[in-house]
Amino acid sequence: MKLTKTALCTALFATFTFSANAQTYPDLPVGIKGGTGALIGDTVYVGLGSGGDKFYTLDLKDPSAQWKEIATFPGGERNQPVAAAVDGKLYVFGGLQKNEKGELQLVNDAYRYNPSDNTWMKLPTRSPRGLVGSSGASHGDKVYILGGSNLSIFNGFFQDTVAAGEDKAKKDEIAAAYFDQRPEDYFFTTELLSYEPSTNKWRNEGRIPFSGRAGAAFTIQGNELVVVNGEIKPGLRTAETHQGKFTAKGVQWKNLPDLPAPKGKSQDGLAGALSGYSNGHYLVTGGANFPGSIKQFKEGKLHAHKGLSKAWHNEVYTLNNGKWRIVGELPMNIGYGFSVSYNNKVLLIGGETDGGKALTSVKAISYDGKKLTIE
């Protein structure tokens, strides 16, 4: 038995290592989960979410750099906004915030940050869809946004909940009605949206040939788009993955294999996973789900996560030749942070871990096709 364990450990650590000598990045000044960010040149911008109305920057090319706070975001505190960078400027869209009545509401406003003079400007536009649970990435002179919750349905749920006051029975009735629906009845966004800053125009880039998502990992590299998992209704994720390609006829999509299950576990899909590219390899890690929810849904339970506990994850997956495999594990569970590809590494910034605790850590992972390195 001891020989078997030793052999297994040797094989495991031959595939991934923890590097003590590589460049390390300073922790965030505050834990940021449910926030957003973008990379402009060598500078990364991260903020909002549990960071309140603050944004912070870090010069990645300077080994001695520390996080710096920039001008306060003028749109107020909000969770799950979308951000991307175009032409050296940072764009922030939507999110979830409380109104004057204390109701959580989806907002569809837009802001631009100019690093050259450290100023924000509210843009004269509104997103055509709710952008909570949406994922964004830039390509050329546009920001592309995938998925998201339905503004009217989501806002209505929170309005009804606040209106119920302290009436627990009424609140339970509202929650039961909200969660006891089919995925398609939540009307998650099923179009790929784009926003072009130079014209201040939104565009419908076509329907996605798969179910609407919230909290999907969404990455654009060159002309390829990758979508990994996400919620298909509140509390229920999918293990599906998809790949798109920009063509003269628009984005052409194809299905990829489902994300595999870790050994001895079920694969209930992930929301809030982090992703990026290292040495040409696509990596995705972390995320959260409700183990057993897909099984309950297949048994006919629409409230698929009822009675289940939320779990955070640490597996690192890579996509190679159209197939997924697990190449290692992070030292901690993580989800709902910000990830960015930089210098052949994927930086995992902030996020949350078990129980929803906000993280200040900045980790870097890299993969060369044989070995996963975690810094």
Swiss-Prot record:
Compartments, as annotated in UniProt: Periplasm
NCBIfam families: muta_rot_YjhT (TIGR03547), PRK14131.1 (NF010730)
Signal peptide: 1-22
PANTHER family: LD33804P (PTHR45632)
GO cellular component: periplasmic space
Protein name: N-acetylneuraminate epimerase
Tree of life domain: Bacteria
Role of this protein: Converts alpha-N-acetylneuranimic acid (Neu5Ac) to the beta-anomer, accelerating the equilibrium between the alpha- and beta-anomers. Probably facilitates sialidase-negative bacteria to compete successfully for limited amounts of extracellular Neu5Ac, which is likely taken up in the beta-anomer. In addition, the rapid removal of sialic acid from solution might be advantageous to the bacterium to damp down host responses.
EC number of this enzyme: 5.1.3.24
Residue ranges of Kelch repeats: 43-87, 89-140, 142-176, 177-222, 225-273, 295-344, 346-375
Keywords: Carbohydrate metabolism, Isomerase, Kelch repeat, Periplasm, Repeat, Signal
